[in-house]
Regions:
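Secretory/periplasmic and organellar redox-cofactor proteins
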Residues: 1-26, 31-43, 47-209
Length: 209
């Protein structure tokens, strides 16, 4: 098991029949998780580059609708295939995963920064167009993986970083809630917490599997 597979085991079942292959190299995550974590990485990069770490203004009505609808396909496909109504495939998995993953960082950021006791004027997204572009980029990433265009190392690296960011989002929410109104290096500590959590969870998974 390489380091990418180790990181992936912290969130994913890693079933071969639901994963991608580059020769003998299996993706560290299943198709759905690959797209989810890819979307998370893209969301984190966007919010960081756009300087939205203080975003606390609720989404616009259309933005909220888009965010809610983005989670609907993964719920329908997951439940429907689990109950045996249809057999899902890797294309459906990457599409539904990308739709769900891109918006998670924004939701965590809003949950961490929003305060009913003050005026929330800093946008997470300036408009719905930003969300839509981010969504389309996440879907494009998933399709490129599905088509086999992207190399193994890039997909594996993005997947591993995405797992760290996923757990890091929880740490960010916790740290910002605990240190509200105080200057505290929440972002780097959140990444460190995410990395630590991945190591602990993956180690436990390896021990019991």
């Amino acid at each position: 098991m390489n380091v990418f597979d180790f990181f992936g085991s912290a969130v994913c079942h890693q079933m071969a029949e639901r994963s991608f292959f580059w020769g003998s190299c299996q993706s560290p995550l299943c198709a759905r998780c690959t797209a989810i974590e890819g979307g998370i990485v893209l969301g984190v990069i966007f919010l960081w580059l756009a300087g939205r770490k203080d975003g606390n203004r609720p989404f616009s009505p259309s933005g909220m609708v888009l965010e809610a609808l983005s989670f609907l396909p993964i719920a329908i496909d997951g439940v429907g295939s689990y109950l045996g109504f249809w057999q899902s495939n890797n294309l459906l998995r990457v599409l539904t995963g990308a739709l769900a993953g891109y918006g998670l960082p924004g939701l965590f950021l809003l949950a961490a920064n929003f305060s009913p006791a003050k005026e929330n004027i800093n946008p997470v997204y300036k408009n719905t167009g930003e969300q839509l572009i981010l969504l389309l980029v996440a879907v494009a990433y998933g399709l490129l993986v599905w088509l086999g265009i992207l190399p193994y190392f890039l997909v594996a690296l993005v997947s591993a970083v995405g797992v760290v960011c996923f757990y890091g989002c929880f740490w960010f929410l916790i740290l910002l809630t605990m240190t509200a109104g105080k200057k505290f290096p929440c972002f780097p500590l959140s990444l460190a917490g995410g990395l630590f959590t991945v190591f602990v969870v993956a180690t436990i998974v390896q021990r019991i599997s």
